[in-house]
Every structure is written in structure tokens, then in C-alpha cells.
Amino acid sequence: MTTPAKKVGFTCGAFDLCHAGHMLVFKEAKTVCDHLIVFLQDDPSIDRAKNKPVMSLPERQIILAGIKYVDEVRIYTTEVDLYEKLKNLKADIRIIGADWKGKQFTGHDLPFEVYYNSRSHNFSTSALRERVYLAEYAKRH
């Protein structure tokens, strides 16, 4: 009797200030794959209009590696770098936010099934940054 092949999935991002929303993304991702690869971007502000991460790459890598839903963490620098890595990736499914429906994303032309995460929550890194800022501001004033 042969063992069924494991379904490999992947998701990509900076995953700065890892929060409950990220956990829900990874948890949902594991419902559509057996092995989850997280592509971690070093600094998204390099080639896109995104915030520079607060946490260092090693900090984010250590946190991601410790999450029970994440099986593997791989690093990429730019969207071009990510595309090159995805071209050679042996995976079945890409997990991406529902806000990307109808939009072009890096690797949209590659032969991966796409699963749009539901995002049935209001957690976000931007909201967390603001909460921390307001809490620190309140302590000082």
C-alpha cells in the first residue's frame, strides 16, 4: 500500500509583529495542505510601498519556526527573488489573502492552485502598531 502524497502549500509575507491574525491565517492554511511553507520577506519596503518591519529577520524567523502550523520557513528579499524561488518550488497550493482576488500578485502566472484565506477577523499589524503607539503615548502624557 502506498502512502498518499502530502499536499504542499505556501504563503508569503513579512509577518512583522506576529499576532493572532497571523495565527488564524496559518491555522486555516493547514486545513488545505499537509506541509506549510512560509516565505518570509526580509524587508518589504525595499521594492514596495510597505512599512519596514519593526522586528529583525532572525526574530521573525524564530517566531515563525515555533508556530505549530508552520512546517518550513524560507527567506526572500524582493518580489523578483520570490518569483525565482516560486518557479522552482514543488508545491500544490498557494494560500493568499482574499483581498488579492482579481488582482495580480507575484507568481500569479505559475501553475499553483490558489486558496484565498477567509480573513474572518480584524487583527492586523497596522492596528497592533497603532495600539502600541497609543499605549506608549498615554504613558508619557
Question: At which residue positions do the language-model features occur?
Answer:
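Nucleotidyltransferase catalytic core that binds NTPs
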Residues: 1-141
